[in-house]
Amino acid sequence: MQPGGQPDMSALLAQAQQMQQQLMAAQQEMAEAEVTGQAGGGLVTATVKGTGEVVGLKIDPKVVDPDDVETLQDLVIGAIEDASNKAQEIAAQKLGPLAGGFGGGGLPGLPGF
């Protein structure tokens, strides 16, 4: 604080720049992170990036039944949802503390922030 109770603008600016750098680093980490989710006890696994992009899908041949496509569809959706939930948890861990530094207003465009 400067005399008269005024905040030191240069200190506030430096703090904002530091927070911006931390946020950018965390966002880059999330963009590069890959998380795997599974369904059916591992019969179907899905890999998503921290951004939510699905980058991999593995299906055990045992679960492929032409007469029961609906079960396979449910397992694929379940695996993708599991991976997406894990990615959101990681994002909350990495970005959540930074969001608090923005006055509690959250981060626009990021779910849960």
Curated annotation (Swiss-Prot):
Its main location: cytoplasm. It comes from Rhodococcus jostii (strain RHA1). Keywords: Cytoplasm, DNA-binding. InterPro entries: YbaB-like_sf (IPR036894), YbaB/EbfC (IPR004401). Belongs to the YbaB/EbfC family. The keyword Signal does not apply. GO terms for cellular component: bacterial nucleoid; cytosol. The lineage of its organism: Bacteria, Bacillati, Actinomycetota, Actinomycetes, Mycobacteriales. GO terms for molecular function: DNA binding. SUPFAM superfamilies: YbaB-like. Binds to DNA and alters its conformation. May be involved in regulation of gene expression, nucleoid organization and DNA protection. Homodimer. It is found in: Cytoplasm, Nucleoid. NCBIfam families: DNA_YbaB_EbfC (TIGR00103). This is Nucleoid-associated protein RHA1_ro04210.
